[in-house]
């Protein structure tokens, strides 16, 4: 098979499996936000992803379905399958045998993390497609040294940045390769200038963001009124404080997690071929090694220093994983060629089929989202709990963007006014009020919340913070909290929670989905506690922690509830679990200090407070 036919075959096979396991609706985290931005040509979270917004909208127009989320999920699967096809084509172009190239591409297609992102609305498939194209074009430009190849490479590099900022992590390897292989490249001023202009030309698609910002009914993350705001959006300024913020111990912990992740992405029997392939690439295809090895090094340098919820960290290693998949193909090919010295390897096709089958079987169940309606049902349950003409203020990623999607795109409960507490999508502030200093914005939002409370409309919150009015309190009402004047009868108006969605089993539920299910149990505990059933409430809180056992926020919130109910040892266990999940957050240590102080263990309390202080 030629490189093109191998790539096409890989794409078709990957896409077929993705369609079988495709999520039928909105999913967790940023899925709802991205769908709302694509369908309404809005401006999603930094860095904006204009290429996905435009191409995803085009695909949704072409598709004949009347299920908006499903169409954008298909777009995600299409680009992911194309990335796998590009990987097979690249390997074939580098001399890897067709069956081995096809196998390596499918092994990556069915790797744990990439598959999970291919079947929901996400940008990573398209981003990695551009990564493969840039690697292929850099190799061609360095070998043929045609000016038009260099210009096309520059354009692809710029375009890749509009898909995901990870693209910049392969740039150092590209520059090193061009300077190394293209003699006098740096001295060709005209070519260098034209190449830079080509990069700018590819990147010019970001003009979509200020042109569309605030227009139409799509999701808009934030106003982009000027050049500074645009730069902050494009560069991901919101996330900068999370980079290079970890101590050495944190970097080592992330390195350990990356290594464990790599062990689980492909079958354990294939792991030696990953690193053997790197060695073979170094010996036989130095150009390919420079690009892939440089990308892996840059990816690890950035991601190992990145502090975020550990459950969300694996996607930040996808660049390193696709480069390791390239090494896997090179190593697998070398193994087959060595065995071929003893005669024609008749076992090649069965061996390739077995390798793909092992990885496919290992990851199918946990990657299958075809029956996963939990996120959508949670959003619908939240909206169903609201009385007519209510106001709901949301925050966080668990449900905020699911609710935004349901109301913005599917028009569920249009009588409800939905606001995001920090201004993502639907904001209490007017568009021009985002020019105010952050502290003034916070005060203004609080004032608006108070005005809503006094207006007489039922005001509900997803997460209770500090009440905007004195003499008012948050009262659990079903899955939400209602803000109302302090009541003398706490049992009045209790709402029965429908728990069916919390008990869905028989399908794989990742950490984010289980966090949603745990919210049912946590709110059941809140309602029972309000009704005076402390024993039942404690049992419900414990069940919430059992369901979302790897969620730092759930374990911490349960610990806090146990502490307030004087269940100190149980509170300590959950606080310790929260600290183990993310050792670089101060709140669990501060809570543990309060627990120890209440137990009279003041020495331990002082040490824990010191630890909390160091992390703030």
PLM segments and residue spans:
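Aromatic- and kink-enriched transmembrane "portal" helix at the membrane-lumen/periplasm boundary
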Residues: 20, 41, 62-69, 73, ...
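Transmembrane-helix motifs of polytopic, lipid-linked glycan transferases
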Residues: 8, 74-95, 133-137, 326-330
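Transmembrane-helix signature of polytopic, membrane-embedded enzymes
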Residues: 4-7, 12, 87-110, 129, ...
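Membrane-interface transmembrane helices that cradle and orient dolichyl/undecaprenyl
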Residues: 92-95, 118, 134-152, 157-159, ...
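C-terminal luminal/periplasmic domains and tails of membrane-associated envelope-modifying transferases
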Residues: 380-391, 398-404, 410-616
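Hydrophobic, aromatic-rich transmembrane alpha-helices
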Residues: 264-286
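Signature aromatic-anchored transmembrane alpha helix within multi-pass, membrane-resident enzymes
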Residues: 282-285, 330-361
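Perimembrane helix-loop-helix junctions
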Residues: 142-143, 170-200
């Amino acid at each position: 098979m030629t490189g093109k036919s191998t790539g096409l075959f890989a794409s078709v096979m990957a896409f077929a499996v993705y369609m079988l396991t495709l999520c039928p609706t909105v999913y967790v985290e940023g899925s709802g936000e991205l769908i709302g931005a694509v369908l309404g040509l809005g401006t999603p979270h930094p860095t904006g992803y204009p290429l996905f917004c435009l191409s995803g909208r085009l695909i949704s127009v072409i598709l004949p379905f009347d299920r908006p989320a499903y169409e954008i999920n298909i777009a995600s699967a299409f680009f992911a399958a194309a990335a796998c096809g590009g990987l097979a084509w690249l390997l074939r172009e580098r001399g890897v045998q067709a069956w081995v190239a096809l196998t390596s591409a499918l092994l990556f297609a069915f790797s744990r993390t990439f598959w999970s992102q291919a079947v929901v609305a996400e940008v990573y498939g398209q981003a990695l497609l551009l990564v493969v194209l840039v690697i292929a074009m850099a190799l061609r430009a360095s070998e043929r040294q045609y000016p038009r190849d260099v210009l096309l490479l520059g354009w692809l590099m710029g375009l890749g940045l509009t898909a995901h900022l990870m693209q910049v992590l392969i740039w150092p390897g590209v520059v090193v390769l061009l300077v190394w292989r293209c003699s006098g490249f740096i001295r060709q001023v005209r070519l260098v200038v034209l190449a830079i202009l080509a990069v700018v030309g590819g990147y010019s698609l970001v003009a979509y963001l200020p042109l569309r910002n605030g227009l139409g009914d799509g999701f808009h993350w934030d106003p982009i009124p000027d050049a500074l705001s645009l730069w902050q959006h494009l560069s991901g300024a919101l996330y900068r404080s999370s980079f290079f913020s970890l101590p050495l111990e944190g970097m080592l912990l992330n390195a350990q997690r990356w290594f464990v992740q790599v062990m689980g992405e492909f079958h354990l029997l294939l792991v030696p071929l990953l690193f053997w392939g790197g060695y073979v690439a170094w010996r036989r295809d130095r150009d390919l090694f420079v690009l892939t090895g440089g990308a892996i090094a840059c990816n690890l340098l950035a991601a190992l220093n990145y502090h975020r919820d550990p459950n969300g960290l694996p996607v930040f290693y996808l660049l390193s994983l696709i480069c390791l998949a390239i090494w896997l193909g090179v190593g697998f090919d070398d193994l087959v060629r060595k065995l071929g010295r003893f005669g024609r390897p008749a076992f090649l096709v069965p061996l390739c089929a077995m390798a793909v089958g092992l990885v496919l079987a290992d990851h199918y169940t946990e990657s299958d989202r075809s029956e996963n309606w939990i996120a959508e049902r949670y959003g619908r349950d939240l909206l169903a709990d609201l009385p007519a003409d209510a106001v709901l203020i949301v925050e966080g990623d668990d449900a905020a963007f699911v609710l935004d999607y349901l109301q913005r795109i599917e028009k569920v409960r249009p009588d409800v006014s939905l606001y995001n507490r920090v201004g993502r999508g639907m904001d209490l502030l007017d568009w021009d009020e985002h020019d105010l200093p952050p502290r003034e914005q916070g005060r203004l939002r609080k004032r608006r919340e108070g005005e809503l409370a006094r207006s007489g409309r039922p005001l509900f919150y997803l997460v209770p913070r500090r009440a905007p009015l004195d003499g008012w309190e948050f009262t659990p009402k079903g899955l939400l909290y209602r803000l109302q004047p302090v009541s003398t009868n706490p049992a009045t108006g209790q709402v029965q929670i429908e728990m069916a969605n919390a008990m869905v089993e028989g399908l794989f539920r990742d950490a984010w989905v289980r966090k949603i299910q745990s919210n049912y149990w946590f709110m059941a505990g809140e309602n029972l506690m309000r009704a005076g059933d402390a024993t039942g409430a404690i049992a419900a809180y414990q069940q919430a922690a059992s369901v979302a056992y790897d969620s730092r926020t759930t374990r911490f919130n349960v610990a806090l509830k146990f502490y307030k109910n004087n269940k100190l040892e149980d509170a300590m266990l959950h606080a310790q679990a929260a600290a183990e999940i993310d050792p670089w957050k101060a709140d669990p240590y501060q809570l543990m200090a309060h627990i120890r102080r209440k137990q009279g263990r003041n020495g331990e309390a002082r040490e824990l407070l010191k630890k909390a202080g160091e992390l703030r």
